[in-house]
């Protein structure tokens, strides 16, 4: 049974298969090898995908797009809140998750991003089945390099809903590098510049010339792509219209906004074919007697978007820094994604790396799906990680758990290669503990409140009578897909403790990964002070608990024992609030010892 490769993009998606010794994209029922990532819900109860959804003559609230920008995210994520105004369809808060409110045939239903994405995947699956004349159940899928754990899990869930088992999940720039490497089979260092419709990724890969491809570094932005260029052009066109006429542009009218967006996309494409000027022409009303007509030259286009374009170079520099490289160390630069067709983008990359290093012969719209298809072919050949194609990718943010007091303990460090497995030894906090939670975080700060919660493991001790400090071992595992699993083992009974892991944490802050790292570096002193206080509190509380155990085992009278335990609880309660100075723990411990001695002597 054939395993296919799918690039599920923000604006366009693509499916490919490896046959006759090479990868090739599969044409859909509309005769195109890329499919717009658009879903429409007309009133007849049907579901339309791609071109037919884009052209559907139905209210815009029934046409869904941009799903990749909020799949696996939380309602209060910054990017979700910022994007709400730009979407013609309704997105609402459903138990902390962004859900799409779809009105179809006078009935309103809630659709998750995973469900919406699964419709696109079903369409691609059907296209592949029609081409191959067989049932397809397995897929290699690609995701942006800096997708977090929740976004990866949600993408895999979308595939499951579409009837597809994800046999491997790889980063988009890694897939592009695979597509190039299998054609050239050379010992080179490759930089992949992946500028798509909704996300931007950079990866640096080293090839041995034997099919072995190692990802040295990667960086990116989850919310930077061609659609952001479209928004800049729309804002410019609206501003020009408002300045020239007495009327204000009707931004509240979704029909008019759709026409303007389509006109801006058309102008962007025209200027991407080396034309020096074009016009943004868009009708204002349904009578077509009033319109926006804005002249847009190549120079003006570059000026409007230059900060955005140059911002991608900052991310390129971050990837180079992570790999401990300079631009001169790069042998080839792969331009991938539809936005790399823009002349100014090519010019900036040419200026940075030199014209001779730019690889433009690889199809930017198809490269990622083709790379996924190559990986699929090698997996299908019978070896999960075949010798001919070794892919090693890296962890982009450290992963760990929250310890007592809100201290973040890194288990898997940023920059480590996966698959990998790490263990952490833990202990219960109180006597006779029956249940507990182990929050899982991603981030670089020592204070968990500044990191991002990605899940939680619930520990159930089955009503065991256990003492404080009961030994546990947590196993953190990142599989070949870059997805995380956590299990906990009772080291004394050697049995797995029942656990439940869910991706339900706080909102993801939409900032560059390198900025997260820079914040951690800038706040290192504050974090170290916090860690010192937490460690001192742990030592203080351990001393108080040891004394509590001694009191409980002692032969003093019940009255004295009760009074002594009351003193213990008073000093434990004091430690719940962190003091300002380290010395306070020493002072309070001395006071505790003196006060409790009154009842235990």
Where on the chain are the PLM-derived regions?
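Oxyanion-binding/catalytic loops of NTP- or PPi-dependent enzymes
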Residues: 1-82, 87-94, 101-119, 126-601
């Amino acid at each position: 049974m054939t395993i296919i490769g799918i690039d599920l993009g923000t604006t366009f998606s693509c499916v490919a298969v490896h046959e006759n010794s090479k990868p090739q994209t599969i044409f859909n029922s509309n005769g195109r090898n890329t499919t717009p990532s658009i879903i429409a819900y007309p009133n007849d109860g049907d579901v339309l995908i791609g071109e037919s959804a884009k052209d559907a003559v139905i209210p815009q609230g029934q046409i869904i797009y941009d799903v990749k920008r909020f799949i696996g995210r939380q309602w209060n994520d910054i990017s979700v809140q910022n994007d709400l105004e730009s979407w013609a369809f309704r997105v609402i808060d459903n138990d902390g998750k962004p859900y799409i409110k779809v009105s179809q045939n006078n009935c309103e239903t809630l659709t998750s991003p995973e469900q919406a994405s699964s419709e696109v995947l079903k369409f691609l699956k059907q296209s592949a089945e029609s081409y191959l004349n067989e049932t397809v159940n397995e897929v290699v899928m690609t995701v942006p390099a800096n997708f977090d754990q929740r976004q990866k899990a949600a993408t895999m869930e979308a595939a499951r809903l579409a009837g597809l088992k994800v046999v491997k999940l790889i980063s988009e720039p890694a897939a592009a590098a695979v597509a190039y490497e299998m054609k050239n089979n050379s010992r080179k260092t490759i930089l992949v510049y992946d500028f798509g419709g909704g996300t931007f990724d950079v990866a640096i890969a080293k090839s041995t010339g034997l099919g072995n491809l190692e990802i040295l570094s990667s960086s990116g932005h989850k919310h930077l792509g061609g659609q952001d260029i479209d928004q800049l052009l729309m804002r410019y066109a609206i501003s020009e219209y408002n300045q020239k006429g007495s009327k204000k542009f009707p931004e509240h009218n979704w029909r008019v906004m759709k026409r303007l967006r389509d006109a801006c996309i058309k102008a962007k494409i025209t200027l991407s074919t080396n034309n020096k000027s074009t016009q943004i022409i868009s009708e204002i009303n349904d009578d077509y007697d009033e319109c926006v007509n804005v002249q847009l030259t190549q120079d003006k286009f570059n000026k409007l978007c230059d900060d955005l374009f140059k911002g991608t170079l900052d991310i390129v520099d971050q990837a180079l820094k992570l790999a401990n490289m300079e631009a001169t160390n790069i042998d080839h630069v792969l331009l991938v994604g539809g936005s790399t067709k823009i002349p100014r983008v090519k010019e900036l990359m040419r200026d940075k790396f030199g014209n001779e290093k730019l690889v433009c012969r690889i199809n930017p719209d198809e490269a990622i799906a083709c790379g996924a298809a190559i990986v699929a072919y090698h997996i299908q050949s019978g070896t999960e990680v075949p010798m001919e194609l070794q892919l090693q990718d890296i962890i982009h943010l450290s992963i760990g758990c929250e310890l007592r007091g809100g201290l973040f303990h890194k288990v898997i460090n940023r920059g480590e290669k996966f698959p990998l497995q790490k263990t952490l030894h833990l202990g219960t906090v109180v006597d006779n503990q029956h249940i507990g939670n182990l929050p899982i975080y991603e981030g670089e700060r020592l204070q968990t409140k500044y990191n991002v919660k990605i899940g939680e493991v619930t520990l159930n001790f089955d009503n065991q009578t256990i003492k404080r400090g009961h030994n546990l071992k947590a196993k953190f595992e990142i599989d070949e897909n870059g997805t995380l699993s956590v299990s906990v083992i009772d080291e004394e009974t050697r049995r797995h403790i029942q656990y439940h892991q869910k991706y339900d944490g706080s909102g993801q802050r939409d900032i560059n990964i390198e900025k997260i790292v820079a914040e951690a570096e800038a706040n290192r002193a504050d974090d170290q002070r916090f860690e010192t206080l937490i460690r001192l509190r742990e030592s203080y509380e351990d001393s108080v608990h040891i004394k509590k155990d001694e009191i409980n085992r002692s032969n003093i009278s019940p009255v004295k024992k009760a009074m002594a335990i009351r003193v213990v609880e008073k000093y434990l309660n004091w430690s719940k609030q962190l003091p300002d100075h380290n010395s306070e723990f020493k002072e309070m411990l001395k006071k505790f010892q003196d006060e409790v001695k009154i009842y235990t002597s």
